Amino acid sequence: LVTQTDHVGSGWNPVSTPSLWSAGGTCNGGTTPTPTPTPTPTPTPTPTPTPTPTPTPTPTPTPTPTPTPTPIPTPTPTPTPTGLAKHALIGYWHNFTNPSGATYPISQVSDDWDVIVVSFGDNAGGGNVSLTIDPGAGTEAQFIADVAAKRAKGKKVILSLGGQNGSVSVGSTAEATNFTNSLYAIITKYGFDGIDLDLENGVAQGAAIQTYLPIAVKNLKAKVGSSFYLSMAPEWVYVEGGYTSYGSIWGAYIPIINALRSELTVLHPQYYNNGDIYTPYATGAIKAGSADQLVATARMLIEGFNYGGNTFAGLRPDQVGFGVPSGRSSAGSGFTTNADVSNALNCLTRLLNCGTIKPLQAYPDFRGVMTWSINWDRHDGYNFSVPTKTVLKTLP
């Protein structure tokens, strides 16, 4: 996924760094377009760190939002129990050294984290994925044992694909097959619960990956079984951005999400490094990092929204979370205070502490919070994970 992660030798800062993955960019800052009938965005890639790279879109129009009826949530089947915490704290663990510090063993990750996202798998070409464990994580045998120990405690440990400079081609039947088989081998070897899709490079309207990635993931789940964990962490431009302007990268993840609704465990877009956002609930852009932004975007994913003449049907509340930076060092923009995280969670689950925007109803099954990153949080003295976990424990 694009903005999310820095690679070896870089800080999760607005610094471009070569990595094992091919070209990546970061959709940061910049003026977010207002919805118009015929937008023509022109993304301008500008690498910046965060749970993924992102091209910086520069749409031409200066749209004016037109009020539209809020789609009513579509009833969805009851989720199958997964063993995942009802309200989860999800974080990315660095399989590389950067200014947050050297890689350290998974065994040293605080048990406050419910989902540990290993960052990242490598592009081995032709749709294949590989994984090389950083020496700082210990021997391969130790890494495997550490993953098993975390899972024995009820934690989920998954492999993320993408990152700030990450890309993998899944543009044909052959590449989809390689993607499935190589990841199944990795999951089996290391004991991962599943994967996280942080792939944005090459994801655009009409791109072959929109067709073949869902096929590959469905086949992977068929091999792994019903316990397969699938998360996605695209920048909001690729999802809710479709409301503003549906074309190019704007809303480009929507077809992938729609194709994988039955397989999806949780969608937690990145709400940092991308600027302010337009939603159906306000005439102007909502400030990045604010509680209103977190509530509004979660509301869009749960209650649905219009895009390109279509309607995005809401996901189950337990399939939705929000992604924020763990501190001011881990992202270039979009920092969220602990108070805003707490207010957003309480508003979404109990209709308490809401600001200007509130959901149509309380969603007590709202999944939780994703952050970039576990390593930066430890570097900063657990200033994010401890208070956020405390709030998550109080939710209904």
Where are these regions (language model features)?
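Chitinase-like catalytic core of GlcNAc-active glycosidases
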Residues: 81-301, 317-321, 326-343, 363-366, ...
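Short, low-complexity, Pro/Ser/Thr/Gly-rich segments in the mature regions of secreted, periplasmic
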Residues: 25-28, 387-395
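Mixed-charge, low-complexity intrinsically disordered regions
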Residues: 16-18, 23-28, 44, 66, ...
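Tryptophan-rich substrate-binding surfaces of secreted polymer-degrading and adhesive proteins
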Residues: 1-36
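A short, acidic, amphipathic alpha-helical segment used as a generic capping/interface helix at domain edges
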Residues: 298-312, 341-362
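Residues that scaffold, gate, or flank divalent-cation-dependent active/transport sites
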Residues: 373
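N-terminal module-boundary/linker segments of secreted carbohydrate-active enzymes
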Residues: 30-113, 121, 394-396
